[in-house]
Curated annotation (Swiss-Prot):
Annotated positions of the Phosphothreonine modification: 198
Record's compositionally biased regions (Polar residues): 130-140
Assembly and oligomerization: Component of the tRNA-splicing ligase complex.
GO biological process, one term: embryonic morphogenesis
Organism name: Bos taurus
Record-given protein name: Ashwin
Ranges of Low complexity composition bias in the record: 144-156
Annotated region (Disordered), positions in chain: 64-232
Subcellular location as annotated: Nucleus
Homology family: Belongs to the ashwin family.
Lineage, highest ranks first: Eukaryota, Metazoa, Chordata, Craniata, Vertebrata
Keywords: Nucleus, Phosphoprotein
Origin: domain of life: Eukaryota
One Pfam family, short name: Ashwin
Gene Ontology CC annotations of this record: nucleoplasm; nucleus; tRNA-splicing ligase complex
Length: 232
């Protein structure tokens, strides 16, 4: 319920302070809610109803606060409370939302988009796909590589042949040295390693006669026990 007082719009709370602007039914209803008895004669007359309303039901002004520290603090709280009420009345729907609604029309294109660059860079991702010419080059390279297989195979066989020749030469030299150094008799040598295997070092076995001679040539003094000298 709202009205106009002096050419300006008034809220319901302000109208309660002006009972002459209220209707007769509203005055009766407020008096009944306040449990104020109204006689039948007064129900017909609006002036008597207004007098009763001013006497018992009109909202009284708030008491003046003292000019102390507590009074100033309470005045600030009242002002803040009134401001909050006004904001809730003006925008009840906006108060429920924590963030304002963002509406994109689609017509504005002035927005700028920032892209973060990674360490490796995204340029490789954005490159175009290779064309058909690149595929033809790969086929040519594969055909060239197939033609160059045979010389590579031959060259891979060369080092094995060289190793075999070197191994045979080493075996022959070792065999000649063993025959020259052992005048007493033939020396048993291990069987030759197969062709292509790793070369094995040959150790010359000492004959039995040389071993016995070395034992006999040892000085006899080494076998004597040490005699302890005793004083007389």
């Amino acid at each position: 319920m709202a009205g106009d007082v002096g050419g300006r719009s008034c809220t319901d709370s302000e109208l309660l302070l002006h009972p002459e602007l209220l209707s007769q039914e509203f005055l009766l209803l407020t008096l009944e809610q306040k449990n104020i008895t109204v006689e039948n004669d007064m129900r017909v007359n609006k002036d008597s109803l207004t007098d009763l309303y001013v006497q018992h039901a009109i909202p009284l002004p708030q008491r003046d606060l003292p000019k102390s520290r507590w009074g100033k603090m309470m005045e600030k709280k009242r002002e803040q409370h009134e401001i909050k009420k006004e904001t809730k009345r003006s925008s009840p729907a906006d108060g429920l939302r924590k963030r304002p609604l963002i509406v994109f029309d689609g017509s504005s294109t002035s927005t700028t988009i920032k892209v973060k660059k990674t360490e490796n860079g995204d340029n490789d991702r954005l490159r175009p796909q290779p064309q058909a010419s690149a595929t033809s080059n790969t086929f040519r390279k594969s055909s060239d590589s197939s033609s160059s297989v045979s010389p590579l195979v031959l060259s891979s066989n060369l080092p094995t042949n060289n190793k075999m020749e070197h191994g045979n030469n080493d075996n022959k030299q070792n065999h000649d040295l063993t025959h020259r150094k052992s005048p007493l008799g033939p020396v048993r040598s291990p069987p030759l390693s197969p062709v292509g295997a790793t070369p094995v070092k040959l150790k010359r076995a000492a004959p039995k006669e040389e071993a016995e001679a070395s034992i006999n040539l040892k000085p006899p003094e080494a076998k004597r026990k040490i005699q302890h000298v005793t004083w007389p």
